[in-house]
């Protein structure tokens, strides 16, 4: 079904407690060089992952709307992934399944939409301009197409600055889950002007 221009999927309003739970602390201490062999090895270890999944809390804050949802992200192969957003009551608000050349999204009324651009689809249906194409790399702790970034003292991403399509995103990582190997991001915050996107990962399963 073609995408409508102004249809918005309604998620429940953001609760104040969620903002606290998803807060990101800017890492302190000296950073490491992006040219270091440790950083190159970490990137390679992450890229070698064939399958992974994570779940946690999602928050979107702007002057126009404040939204909270639980999310589940599952990558099953190269450019094949599934994103699920649920409201605080556990009901599915959005399910997105992507594979090369085809993206399908089902909303909370069971309506199905198709496109070849997941980022554009989510933006039109939710009103939230989520940089999904870049976020697929950022959520793994990889810079993607960004060349302006900083590392923490453990040779992992601590900050990214990236400009594209009139957006100027700054990504700050608040910590990593060291129970997984390689270590994966535990929480992160994306900002562009008055927009903020917060992700707090409860856990990771990597293969």
From Swiss-Prot:
Membrane topology qualifier: Lipid-anchor
Lipidated sites in chain (N-palmitoyl cysteine): 22
GO cellular component, one term: cell outer membrane
Pfam families: LolB
CDD domains to which the protein is assigned, alphabetical: LolB (cd16326)
InterPro entries: LolA/LolB/LppX, OM_lipoprot_LolB
Location(s), subcellular: Cell outer membrane
Highest taxon above the source species: Bacteria
Coiled-coil residues: none
Stated family: Belongs to the LolB family.
Protein name (database record): Outer-membrane lipoprotein LolB
Source organism phylogeny: Bacteria, Pseudomonadati, Pseudomonadota, Gammaproteobacteria, Enterobacterales
């Amino acid at each position: 079904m073609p995408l409508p221009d102004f249809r918005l999927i309604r998620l429940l309003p953001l609760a104040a407690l969620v903002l606290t739970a998803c807060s990101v602390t800017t890492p302190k201490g000296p950073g490491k060089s992006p040219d270091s062999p440790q950083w190159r090895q970490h990137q390679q270890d992450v890229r070698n992952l064939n399958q992974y999944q994570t779940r946690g809390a999602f928050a979107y804050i702007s002057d126009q709307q404040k939204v909270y949802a639980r999310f589940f992200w599952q990558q099953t192969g190269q450019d094949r992934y599934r994103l699920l957003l649920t409201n605080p009551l556990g009901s599915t608000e959005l399910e997105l399944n992507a594979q090369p050349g085809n993206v399908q999204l089902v909303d909370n009324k069971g309506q199905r939409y198709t496109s070849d651009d997941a980022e554009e689809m989510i933006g039109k249906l939710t009103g939230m301009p989520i940089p999904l194409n870049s976020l697929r790399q950022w959520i793994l702790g990889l810079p993607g197409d960004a060349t302006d970034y900083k590392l923490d003292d453990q040779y992992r991403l601590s900050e990214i600055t990236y400009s594209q399509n009139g957006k100027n995103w700054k990504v700050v990582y608040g910590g990593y889950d060291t129970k997984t190997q390689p270590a994966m991001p535990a929480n992160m915050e994306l900002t562009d002007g008055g927009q903020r996107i917060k992700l707090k990962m409860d856990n990771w399963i990597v293969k």
